[in-house]
């Protein structure tokens, strides 16, 4: 592992060769050359499909495909690579848990506790399964620090509480609840915990054994990998208890017109031809990341967010919604609509996001209709911070009387 060098890290990203300033990594990360090359080589040189053909190239491809599963298991300190299921992304992973695990077990009146800080991907699937089963969704509110109020869980948990859905890291504030404490409360009541790791996996991948996590989901594209590939980790006994969501090739053991028997997990949950290119690309991203000190890289990103926050705080009307010195900086200006601001920033070459960030209940709790969000990554620089601040100043001159 090398000492983190921002300039060397940045040089690995072809998309940064232009003059733009990219501050939207919380939406999707840019891709390093290693991932671009691995994906290109797959499409250029690979032949065959995984877990199907018997010729040598197909067998080698299957081995690479399964080796990637092992890499993800190592990233999360999962006890077994068979606890790793390939999906299209975090959203599909959570929906799979809701439909394949929760739906067959929930009864009318059962409760699903969901934090108000959740991305819609960790709320809407639970609202859907509640409608389907007669269960109800119970809101876990924020505390004074704008974090899910984990200390309220003992009051919210009842004999009907079945599932806790909690994000590792907010995609708006960057706040991280005390997962260990929340999981302890939930497990003491016999609940199953679904952790949304879409943001957290990028900054500090969860140790699923140490935290005793039941289900954990993340997406490859936020972790410098390709789009369309995601991960669901589940404890072995929970995955085996899940009914397959999709039926088709390679998820079955035997099939007749009288019925079928499924493969064991994870393959019973992976019907059809998988996103092999996505798996190969994610594997390349993890191999590439292993050469860097993630903690040092995270410290760099956080320092840039702090520089930006401190500079913008000198402008009238500035409000920050940032938590815990995160690398995500959600902010707004009094009297300035976020859509107007982001439009001007785009004209000035600054790429960031504005709006509700797929977290409408959280924005309502924060008392705003939307915010701007600058999300800093290890490939960003102090020059990017200066460019953001200068662009904001130009925009404020036009937008504020």
Curated annotation (Swiss-Prot):
What Pfam families does its record include?
Aminotran_5 (PF00266)
Q: Which PANTHER family match?
A: CYSTEINE DESULFURASE (PTHR43586), CYSTEINE DESULFURASE 1, CHLOROPLASTIC (PTHR43586:SF8)
Q: Which residues of this protein are catalytic? A: 358
Biological process, per Gene Ontology: iron-sulfur cluster assembly; L-cysteine catabolic process; selenocysteine catabolic process; sulfur amino acid metabolic process; sulfur compound transport
Q: How is its activity regulated?
A: Cysteine desulfurase activity is increased 2-fold in the presence of CsdE.
Return the similarity comment. Answer: Belongs to the class-V pyridoxal-phosphate-dependent aminotransferase family. Csd subfamily.
Keyword check for Hydrolase: yes
Question: Residue positions of the PTM N6-(pyridoxal phosphate)lysine?
Answer: 222
Please give the catalytic activity noted in the UniProt record: (sulfur carrier)-H + L-cysteine = (sulfur carrier)-SH + L-alanine; L-selenocysteine + AH2 = hydrogenselenide + L-alanine + A + H(+); 3-sulfino-L-alanine + H2O = sulfite + L-alanine + H(+)
Q: How does it assemble?
A: Homodimer. Forms a heterodimer with CsdE.
Question: SUPFAM superfamilies under this entry?
Answer: PLP-dependent transferases
What this protein is called in its record is Cysteine desulfurase CsdA
The answer to keyword Phosphoprotein applying to this record is no
Q: Which residues form the signal peptide?
A: none
Which species does the entry assign this protein to?
Answer: Escherichia coli (strain K12)
Q: What induces it?
A: Induced in persister cells.
Q: CDD domains in the record, alphabetically? A: SufS_like
Which Gene Ontology molecular-function terms are recorded?
cysteine desulfurase activity; cysteine sulfinate desulfinase activity; hydrolase activity; pyridoxal phosphate binding; selenocysteine lyase activity; sulfurtransferase activity
């Amino acid at each position: 592992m090398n000492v983190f060098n921002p300039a060397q890290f940045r040089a690995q990203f072809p998309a940064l060769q232009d003059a733009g300033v990219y501050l939207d990594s919380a939406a999707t990360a840019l891709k390093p050359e290693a991932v671009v090359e691995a994906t290109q080589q797959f499409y250029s040189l690979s032949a065959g499909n995984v877990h199907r053909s018997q010729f040598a190239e197909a067998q080698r491809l299957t081995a690479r495909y399964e080796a990637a599963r092992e890499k993800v298991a190592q990233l999360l300190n999962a006890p077994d690579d068979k606890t790793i299921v390939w999906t299209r992304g975090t959203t599909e992973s959570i929906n799979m848990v809701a439909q394949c695990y929760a739906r067959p077990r929930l009864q009318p009146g059962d409760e699903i506790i969901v934090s108000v800080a959740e991305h819609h991907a960790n709320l809407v699937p639970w609202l859907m399964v509640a409608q389907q089963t007669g269960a109800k969704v119970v809101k876990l509110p924020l505390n004074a620090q704008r974090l899910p109020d984990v200390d309220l869980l003992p009051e919210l948990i009842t004999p009907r509480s079945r599932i806790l859905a909690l994000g590792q890291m907010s995609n708006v504030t960057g706040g991280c609840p005390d997962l260990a404490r929340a999981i302890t409360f939930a497990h003491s009541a016999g609940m199953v915990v679904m952790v949304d790791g879409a943001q957290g996996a990028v900054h500090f991948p969860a140790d699923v054994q140490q935290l005793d996590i039941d289900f954990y989901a993340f997406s490859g594209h936020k972790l410098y990998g390709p789009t369309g590939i995601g991960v669901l980790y589940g404890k072995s006994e929970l995955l085996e208890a899940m009914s397959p969501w999709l039926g088709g090739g390679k998820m079955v053991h035997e099939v007749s017109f009288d019925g079928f028997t499924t493969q064991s997990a994870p393959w019973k949950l992976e019907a059809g031809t998988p996103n092999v290119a996505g798996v190969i690309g994610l594997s390349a991203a993890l191999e590439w990341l292993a050469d860097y000190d993630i903690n040092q890289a995270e410290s760099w990103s956080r320092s840039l967010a702090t520089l930006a926050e401190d500079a913008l705080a000198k402008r009238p009307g500035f409000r920050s919604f940032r938590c815990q010195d995160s690398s995500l900086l959600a902010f707004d200006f009094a009297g300035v609509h976020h859509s107007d601001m982001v439009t001007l920033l785009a004209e000035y070459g600054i790429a960031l996001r504005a709006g509700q960030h797929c977290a409408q209940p959280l924005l309502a709790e924060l008392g705003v209709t939307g915010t701007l969000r600058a999300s800093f990554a290890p490939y960003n620089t102090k020059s990017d911070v200066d460019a953001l601040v200068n662009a904001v100043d130009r925009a404020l001159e036009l937008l504020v009387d």
